[in-house]
Regions:
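Inter-Walker segment of RecA-like/P-loop motor cores
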Residues: 167-205
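Walker A/P-loop
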Residues: 118-142
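N-terminal alpha-helical interaction blocks
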Residues: 1-34
């Protein structure tokens, strides 16, 4: 299950079964289009962030500087991907166990968020700090999970992810959840609910039915 909804190099597929690696979709780490090299992990097309160097494969390979801190993506790198199949057990009701109370305006926003989730559309939630944005998304998350969907809450900042994790876990105690950020020693687990830094999203591909990005105006996401 390590590969479902993800795109990884061979060295990152430590726990994947060999049979699944054979079945996985494969594409090169770097490709060329219209005279430009493109990193298929981070999307970088800046020539200044592509360098060439002798490689262990026996040739000179270009590699991407833009996502180098997540491991080197080279011309000879092969990325492995299996489509997301949402192989999760349906959570037992009540999925959402938050006991708080929304104000009338918060409730209206929450209902509109649920409508957006059900219609599979995009919505911007814009409010001052402390307005209860996190609590307003709870019903939207629950609506997606009830349909067997996969949900990710992402932020450019590790501290925000660490602050969100216990609040989300308390609201959805019966739903398996993974927390992903650089340096986290817990590693990856295949779960219906994910909290991750935006950098970690580069290892996913078409994985989530609902993606919520917090602090969207923060560096480095914006």
């Amino acid at each position: 299950k390590e590969l479902y909804g993800r795109e990884l190099t061979r060295s990152e597929c430590r726990n994947a079964e060999e049979a699944l690696l054979i079945l996985a979709e494969k594409r090169p780490g770097l490709t060329s289009a219209n005279g430009k090299r493109i990193c298929n992990r981070c999307g970088n097309q800046d020539r200044k962030k592509m360098l060439a160097a002798p490689c262990a494969c026996g040739t000179t390979c270009f590699y991407c500087l833009s996502c180098l801190n997540m491991g080197k993506i080279k011309s000879c790198t092969v990325l492995h991907h299996l489509p997301e199949i949402n192989a999760f057990e349906r959570p037992i009701e009540p999925i959402l166990q938050w006991q708080g109370q929304l104000s009338s305006e918060q409730q209206r926003a929450s209902e509109e968020i649920v409508e957006t989730v059900q219609a599979e559309e995009t919505r911007l939630i814009w409010a001052v700090a402390g307005a209860g944005k996190t609590e307003m998304i709870f019903e939207g998350i629950a609506a997606c999970l009830r349909k067997g969907g996969r949900v990710c809450l992402a932020s450019p900042r590790v501290d925000v992810c660490l602050e969100l994790a216990p609040r989300i876990k308390q609201a959805f105690p019966a739903v398996p959840m993974a927390l992903l950020y650089g340096g986290n020693e817990d590693g990856y687990s295949y779960t219906p609910l994910v909290i991750a830094t935006t950098h970690q999203l580069l290892r996913f591909r078409e994985a989530f039915d609902l993606l919520i990005i917090d602090e969207i105006d923060s560096f480095p996401y914006h």
